[in-house]
Amino acid sequence: MTEYTPKERLYRALRKQPVDRMPAVCFTQTATVEQMEASGAYWPEAHADAEKMATLAEAGHTVIGFEAVRVPFDITAEAELFGCGIKAGDLKQQPSVIKHVVKNMEDMEKLKGYSLNEGRVGLILEAIKILSEKYGKELPIIGSMIGPFSLAQHINGDAWFGNLFTGEEIVPALLDFCSDFNVAYAKAMVENGADTIAIIDPTASYELIGGEFYEKYALPYQKKIVDAMKELDVGTVLHICGNTTNGLSIMDKTGVNGISVDQRVDIKTATDNVENAIIIGNLDPVAILWNGTPEDVAEASKKVLDVGVGLLSPGCGIVSMTPSANLQKMVECAKNYKY
C-alpha cells in the first residue's frame, strides 16, 4: 500500500479511506511540562504569545512524536474575547473562566462588535499561521475551539443550566450567537492554515444534559460548524467529556468525521453505536498516561486497538505532568497499528 504523509494519512483516516497505518495524533490538549522544558516555551506565557504557543505546539511533534500540531492548550480564549474574566493558570494549570458577562437579553449587546484579530483568539490564529508555514505541507494543522454550548455557559455562568431547564429566551439567543462566532472562527483558522478543526464542548455532555436537551440545545449548533467545514473539505472532530455512551448516536448526527470519547466510554459499544464518525480515544489521561508506566500504556492501548478504535488517543486533555515516555509509547502503539 502507498505510504502517505501524516497530513494525507489523517485526511484519509478521518474519511474512512484506506491508509497504510494508523495516524498518531491527539485532538485534545497536548502540552506537558517536559515539552515546555525541552522547547523553552512555558505556560502561562505560551497561552498569550503566538511564537511561544507555536513553539510549544511543535514540541508535541518533535518531542513526543505526534503526527500533527495543535493549538491552543485551553478553552478560555473565546470567552475572554467577549469580556469574561480569566484566571491565567500557571506552569501546570490551564486558564479558567472566573467571571461571566451576560445575565439577560440586554447584556447580549456587550458581545457584539468583536474582532477575530483581537486578544488571544487573534494570537491563536497567528500561531496557526506560523505552524502552517513550517509544517503545513507535511503535518495536519489542528485548530481547536470550545463548542457553542460550553461557550454559552462560560458567558452566562452559573445561571446557564437553570435558564436551560426553564426555557429562557437567553438560551437560543446565546447559542445562535456562539455558533455563528464558532463558524467565523473556524473559517479564520482554515484561512490561516488549519486543515482539521477540533470542537471541544465539555458541558454538552450526555451525563449533564441528557439526550433530549442535547438534541435541542447542542446538536444543531455543533452541526452548524461541521456543515461550514464540510463546504471547505475540512475534517472535524468533536470531543465531549464524561460517559457519553448513550448519547453517541445523537452526536453522530452532527456529521463530524470523528468523535473523541472519554475513558469511561466502552470503545466496543461506541463503535457499535456510531455509524458515520470514527471513534477516537480513549486512554485514561490520569491513571494510565500520567500515573502509569510505558508498559501500562502499551497494555491499555492494545485493549483499545483490539476492539476497533478509529484513532488511538487520550480520553481527555493530557495532564501537564504526564511523562514524555508514556506519550511516546502511545504514539508508538498507534504507528505500529495497521487497520
From Swiss-Prot:
EC number, UniProt record: 2.1.1.247
GO biological process: methane biosynthetic process from dimethylamine; methylation; one-carbon metabolic process; porphyrin-containing compound biosynthetic process
Keyword field: Metal-binding, Methanogenesis, Methyltransferase, Transferase, Zinc
Keyword hit for Methyltransferase: yes
Pathway the protein takes part in: One-carbon metabolism; methanogenesis from methylated amine
Enzyme category, top tier: transferase
Pfam families noted in UniProt: URO-D (PF01208)
Taxonomic superkingdom: Archaea
InterPro entries (alphabetical): Methanogen_methyltrans, Methylcob_mtaseMtbA, Mtase_MtaA_CmuA, UROD/MetE-like_sf, Uroporphyrinogen_deCOase
Record GO terms (molecular function): [methyl-Co(III) methylamine-specific corrinoid protein]:coenzyme M methyltransferase activity; dimethylamine methyltransferase activity; metal ion binding; uroporphyrinogen decarboxylase activity
Catalytic function, reaction form: methyl-Co(III)-[methylamine-specific corrinoid protein] + coenzyme M = Co(I)-[methylamine-specific corrinoid protein] + methyl-coenzyme M + H(+)
Cofactor: Zn(2+)
Binding positions (Zn(2+)): H239, C241, C316
Sequence similarity: Belongs to the uroporphyrinogen decarboxylase family. MtbA/MtaA subfamily.
Task performed by this protein: Methyltransferase involved in methanogenesis from methylamines methanol pathway. Catalyzes the transfer of the methyl group from the methylated corrinoid protein MtmC (MtmC1 or MtmC2) to coenzyme M, forming the substrate for coenzyme-B sulfoethylthiotransferase.
This protein's name: Methylcobamide:CoM methyltransferase MtbA
